[in-house]
Amino acid sequence: MKHLYFLLTAIIGFIFNTSCSSPKAETGKSSIITVTIEPLRYFTEAIAGDKFDVVSMVPDGSSPETYDPTPQQLVALAQSQAYFQIGHIGFEQTWIQRLQANTPHLPFYDMSENVPLMEGTCHETHQHNHDHDVDPHIWNSTKNAEIIVKNIYHALCQLDSIHQAYYAHRLDSVTALIRETEQQMQTLMKDADRTFLIYHPALTYFARD
């Protein structure tokens, strides 16, 4: 259990360091990217740096399974340059088609592309019982994180090709941090038990790795 505690601390530290490695977006920037959840915002900010203001549809502390966007958020979405989705989370299953219909000009990018997906479990939302065929918690894995940041990089280059070298440099830095974190976790787990219990099944990808 002690090994698992330190390992989870390493994961949290990785996400925190990723979010802190890029300048916080300032209010009033003209270029906005909307993402679904906070972990994806952290990754996107790490690659986008000061070129885009990144905002989350699901606020910190809210459930991505049950959250409904506010009218103000729906209006603000129309001002975004793009929408980055995490892929298979409850909010997106409920809302993504409606968001696309309401903003036909807005490009949507799926950051789960090329991620080796795992079978999920049944989650209950406020509207339906969604039997998730896919576990949506893809960000809780350093191996997946490498794929996610590459997807973000490619999307940003499509949106803003003039700054491709800038994004490539930041991608290299973030990838190095991810790999360093992976090495630290492997060291911590070398002699640890390989079985653990968790209340919410959010670490399936981590357990696989």
Q: In which residue ranges do the predicted regions lie?
A:
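Extracytoplasmic metal-acquisition and chelation regions
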Residues: C20-D209
